[in-house]
Regions:
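A non-catalytic, amphipathic alpha-helix used as a structural packing/dimerization or gating element
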Residues: 86-93, 146
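Short, surface-exposed connector motifs at secondary-structure boundaries
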Residues: 96-104, 159-160
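Metal-coordinating catalytic core of metallo-dependent amide/deamination hydrolases
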Residues: 115-160
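Active-site mouth loops of central-metabolism enzymes
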Residues: 74-88
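N-terminal metal-binding scaffold of metallo-dependent hydrolase/deaminase domains
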Residues: 1-30, 40-41
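Short acidic/polar active-site loop segments enriched in Thr and Asp
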Residues: 104-105, 126
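Divalent-metal (often Zn2+) His-rich catalytic cores of metallo-beta-lactamase-fold enzymes
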Residues: 106-116
Length: 160
């Protein structure tokens, strides 16, 4: 897209894993890679701005329920059984699905965020991470403390 218009029949020159330019007549020796884009689409990566990625594991669990009934009677009790390892693998599944669909970055608010960060780094996807907080409640300070720790450790954003 140039000046807000879709452009067609372009070459993409890649250098050090980054798009360098769109040359009209590329010379192979000048670039690490040239992608001939005939019958293809190149577009920026998508960003999912509200996720609870490890919840992919709850897909189709107790469908067709009212939100609060679903949360209070199904999801929140199930989340009490989550741990670092389960969140890592749930996040890994979510990232495979995101990347396959063109998502290259996400914003997640859930729990066990160190596990989510490890999975994101391994998958090569970028993310902003925070411990999810829904009101302060009885465990509010714990969630705030977890977010401060994420920030101090530098895992509030995945490194990919």
């Amino acid at each position: 897209m140039q000046d807000g218009k879709v452009t067609e029949h372009k070459n993409i020159a890649v250098e050090d894993k980054y798009i360098k330019e769109f040359p009209e007549n590329p010379k192979e020796e000048e670039y690490d890679e040239i992608i001939e884009g005939h019958d293809m689409l190149a577009m920026p990566g998508l960003v999912n701005t509200h996720t609870h990625v490890a919840m992919t594991l709850f897909r189709s669990y107790a469908d067709d329920m009212a939100l609060m009934d679903w949360l209070q009677n199904k999801i929140w009790p199930a989340e009490d059984h989550l741990d670092d390892d389960i969140v890592y693998w749930g996040s890994t599944l979510a990232f495979a699905e995101m990347i396959r669909g063109g998502t290259t970055a996400f914003c997640d608010m859930y729990m066990f965020m160190d596990a989510c960060a490890r999975a994101a780094d391994k998958a090569g996807i970028r993310g902003n991470l925070a411990r999810g907080l829904a009101g302060i409640g009885p465990n509010g300070q714990k969630g705030i403390d977890e977010n401060v720790e994420l920030y101090k450790k530098g895992t509030a954003a995945s490194k990919s």
